[in-house]
C-alpha cells in the first residue's frame, strides 16, 4: 500500500503506528516509491493517542482500555507487531510536558510531516496535553 500511495497519492495517514515503524518502514517506503515515480515527497501524517500526565502508569492503563479495539484489528495489529508493541498503550505518547514534547518532536526525525494527536485522560490532563501541543506549533 505504501508503494502505491507513494507512486499515486500525496501521502499517507497512519494510526497506531509507532516511531520506529514510521522511521524504518513507513516514511522510507513511501518516499522511495514517490521518488521512483518522479513525484514530490509525500506527506506522512501520524496519529497517536497523547496524554500529558504526572501518572504515567494510570495513563497507559487508560490508553490500553480506551484504544483496546485497535490491537484486535488486523491492519493496526500488524503495525503494532512491527513496532514490537503489545498493544495501543505501548505506542501512546504519555508523560510530563517535556517528555511528550520530545516524543512529538522525534516523530519529525522519523519522517513524519504532520502529527494528529488524539488527546485522552482526565479533563486536566487533556487541557495540559492541548497546551503542550499548542506550544509546538
Regions from the language model: what does each represent?
Residues 1-137:
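Active-site-adjacent structural elements that line small-molecule/cofactor binding pockets in enzymes
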